[in-house]
């Protein structure tokens, strides 16, 4: 029986995927698996029995990845599960920036007691007139699951779309419309595009990437959209550019005191993935990834350990070893197992940066003596008996 703790409310559609071998517990200290959305785990004590953390969403800056890796705790996320929900809001944000619908709605609210509101509207509506997006140039920075969907939809709206991503995956490239023009220098997007939307992860290299220097290279009157991470934009620089007219609109899904209520800012209360469909998709994907790992040791969509899949174990035992990515580890593992007179029927070893993951199918059930012997090897973080 595996126990699962939910640090945030998780969609029932996802939790319903759990079989009778699972129990949801309110006590994290009893859990082998944790499901989380936005709750911060950085200050939490991670119990020794915790095996996996699954984030129902893409961003994982609320999870201590290195700490988990050192403890042999696999962290999963759900890339692409909420992509359509975010894409739709990005398109909505772009349309709201093109036409002052928000301002018009506020005028209607303020004029609700005017008996001649319809007549007044005909006079006032020119204040809220805008432009169409058809024929305009959109630059998409980051061609992951969301960026690709935004680019493809913008093409269908008649926009001229430019995409930039030096690390674009093969899968993303296959899904990208042929009408999207791929550029190799982000400054081409800065110089040419009327709208710029960013869809990159928050890293040291991307933090504050939309700053005074970048904005100075953009077209006058550019519209900036940020539905990825709040810290990707230096919002003080963005506000200065709004005041000067260099930036026409800044659309963000991340409310904060800097931009809330500021002229030219359209700030949405983090609704990108807040659809029933997105929450259901993320929950299902997170639960399925966690179940496959807990039951079989397979790793899919982890952000701190390499992908690894050996299917369902057909042998008497399966062992998973978390260790440093250094030389001679495999030789030591096989030597210890051989000394116990146990035959290895299948094995795989994968690495990611400074850590590695080894799974071994053995023809005898793993004993406590074997586990302790493997655990004593220098460089091993954790030994887990999967079966």
Please annotate each region the language model reported.
Residues 147-148:
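N-terminal Rossmann-fold NAD(P) dinucleotide-binding loop
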Residues 250, 263, 271-387:
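NAD(P)-dependent dehydrogenase/reductase Rossmann-like domain
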Residues 143-144:
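Glycine-rich Rossmann-fold phosphate-binding loop(s) that bind the pyrophosphate
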Residues 1-78, 211-213, 223, 234, ...:
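An N-terminal-biased, well-structured beta-alpha scaffold segment characteristic
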């Amino acid at each position: 029986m595996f126990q699962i703790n939910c640090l945030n409310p998780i969609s029932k559609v996802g939790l319903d995927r759990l079989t009778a071998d699972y129990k949801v517990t309110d006590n994290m200290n009893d859990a082998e698996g944790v499901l989380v959305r936005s709750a911060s785990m950085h200050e939490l004590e991670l119990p020794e029995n915790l095996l996996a953390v699954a984030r129902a969403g893409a961003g994982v800056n609320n999870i201590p990845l290195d700490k988990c890796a050192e403890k042999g705790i696999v962290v999963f996320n759900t890339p692409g599960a909420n992509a359509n929900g975010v894409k739709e809001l990005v398109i909505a944000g772009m349309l709201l920036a093109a036409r002052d619908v928000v301002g018009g709605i506020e005028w209607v609210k303020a004029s609700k007691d005017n008996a001649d509101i319809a007549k007044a509207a005909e006079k006032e509506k020119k204040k809220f007139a805008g432009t169409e997006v058809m024929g305009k140039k959109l630059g998409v920075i980051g061609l992951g699951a969301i960026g690709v969907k935004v680019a493809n939809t913008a093409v269908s709206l008649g926009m001229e779309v430019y995409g930039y991503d030096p690390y674009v995956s093969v899968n993303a490239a296959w899904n990208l419309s042929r009408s999207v023009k791929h550029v190799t220098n982000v400054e081409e997007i800065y110089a040419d595009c009327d709208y710029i939307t960013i869809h990159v992860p928050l890293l040291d290299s991307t933090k504050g990437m939309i700053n005074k220097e970048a904005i100075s290279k953009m077209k006058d009157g550019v519209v900036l959209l940020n539905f990825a991470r709040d810290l990707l934009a230096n919002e003080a620089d963005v506000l200065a550019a709004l005041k000067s007219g260099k930036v026409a609109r800044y659309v963000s899904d991340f409310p904060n005191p800097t931009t809330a209520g500021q002229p030219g800012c359209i700030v949405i209360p983090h609704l990108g993935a807040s659809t029933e469909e997105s929450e259901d998709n993320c929950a299902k994907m997170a639960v399925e990834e966690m179940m496959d790992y807990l039951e079989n040791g397979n790793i899919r969509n982890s952000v701190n350990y390499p992908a690894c899949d050996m299917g369902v174990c057909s042998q008497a035992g399966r062992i998973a070893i978390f260790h440093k990515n250094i030389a001679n580890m495999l030789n030591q593992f096989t030597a210890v197992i051989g000394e116990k007179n146990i035959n290895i029927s299948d094995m795989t070893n994968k690495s990611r940066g400074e850590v590695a993951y080894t799974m071994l199918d053995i023809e005898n059930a793993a004993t406590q003596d074997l586990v302790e012997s493997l655990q004593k090897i220098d460089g091993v973080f954790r030994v887990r008996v999967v079966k």
